[in-house]
Curated annotation (Swiss-Prot):
Name of the featured protein: Myoglobin
Superkingdom of source: Eukaryota
Compartments where found: Cytoplasm, Sarcoplasm
Gene Ontology, cellular component aspect: extracellular exosome; sarcoplasm
Assembly notes: Monomeric.
InterPro entries: Globin (IPR000971), Globin-like_sf (IPR009050), Myoglobin (IPR002335)
EC number: 1.7.-.-, 1.11.1.-
GO terms, biological process: removal of superoxide radicals
Length: 154
């Protein structure tokens, strides 16, 4: 299920367009996640009181978390599936501390693709989208495997 060199080139090529503005991309991903899947917001005590779109948009914590999420994802993507060292601590914290279900990873990965497509329509064509979806599926599957190692079946 691995990606070809060409697919990784697509993934890393678009990621190079995302990286200069991780904050805006990350903020949009988190806001969209909470809007489309409100149950995900309930996992974050610090975001529970942000009940309007304006509150989410003006929250420095939402911006910070979005940046953190995309920074971690970028480090993992750049490893081109040799991401054990990056993935293990992320999976451990999400499985044992935060208890984030794998389904939520699926939600956020779908949203990441949509946000990139909206922000970079001319650079994120069908081949790049397919490659990114494949890379994110690989990430989710590897996270799910690690979850099992940590005894979390989420």
């Amino acid at each position: 299920m691995g990606l070809s060199d060409d697919e990784w080139n697509h993934v890393l090529g678009i990621w190079a367009k995302v990286e200069p503005d991780l904050t805006a991309h990350g903020q949009e991903v988190i806001i969209r996640l909470f809007q489309l899947h409100p149950e995900t917001q309930e996992r974050f005590a610090k975001f529970k009181n942000l009940t309007t779109i304006d509150a989410l948009k003006s929250s420095e914590e939402v911006k910070k978390h979005g940046t953190t999420v995309l920074t971690a994802l970028g480090r993992i993507l750049k490893q081109k599936n040799n991401h054990e060292q990056e993935l293990k601590p992320l999976a451990e914290s999400h499985a044992t501390k935060h208890k984030i279900p794998v389904k939520y990873l699926e939600f956020i990965c779908e949203i990441i693709v949509k946000v990139i497509a909206e922000k970079h329509p001319s650079d994120f064509g069908a081949d790049s989208q397919a490659a990114m979806k494949k890379a994110l599926e690989l990430f989710r599957n590897d996270m799910a495997s690690k979850y099992k190692e940590f005894g979390f079946l989420g």
